[in-house]
């Protein structure tokens, strides 16, 4: 995520995807996966969740913009909600609502990070705010990339903050 060669980063993620599969099939090589394997087995953590996290990381390599909330939601789910869902399994949740809460809290955390990091992400050529919402609030992408924040931008950010608040409250 921090300015690495995308080809190298993608290769590393592919390697970790394979290593994750190896962990679930009893043949991990890396010390981290060897240490994690018994935890995964003890808590019956689903293999698919680990793949979803890597899918989210790959989205960071392949995408710099998201068309709408649905697309951004998927990214937030993969990089944050899935971590909460895995944590709920480890903590031994007993109420099914815990999974919905973990899902929504992950979305809220990631959206909060996106709001916090708008300037930093823009300096790296990324805008995580949905394109359709930029258009709805009349905020050109160039304005964000140039670090120029208008009243329309403030309204857009208020909208995002309210969305995050609602996710925290669910």
Predicted ranges, named:
Residues 1-169:
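Acidic catalytic motifs of isoprenoid enzymes
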């Amino acid at each position: 995520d921090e300015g690495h060669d995308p080809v190298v980063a993608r290769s590393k993620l592919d390697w970790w995807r394979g290593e994750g599969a190896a962990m679930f099939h009893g043949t991990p090589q890396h010390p981290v996966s060897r240490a994690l394997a018994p935890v995964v087995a003890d808590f019956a953590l689903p293999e698919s969740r680990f793949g979803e996290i890597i899918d989210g990381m790959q989205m960071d390599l392949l995408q710099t913009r998201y068309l709408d909330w649905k697309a951004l939601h998927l990214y937030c789910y993969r990089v944050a909600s899935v971590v909460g869902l895995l944590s709920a399994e480890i903590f031994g949740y007993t109420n099914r609502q815990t999974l919905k809460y973990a899902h929504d809290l992950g979305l809220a955390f990631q959206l909060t990070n996106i709001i916090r990091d708008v300037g930093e992400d823009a300096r790296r050529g990324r805008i995580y705010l949905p394109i359709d919402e930029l258009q709805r609030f009349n905020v050109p992408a160039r304005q964000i990339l140039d670090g120029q924040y208008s009243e329309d931008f403030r309204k857009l950010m208020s909208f995002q903050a309210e969305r995050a608040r609602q996710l925290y409250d669910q």
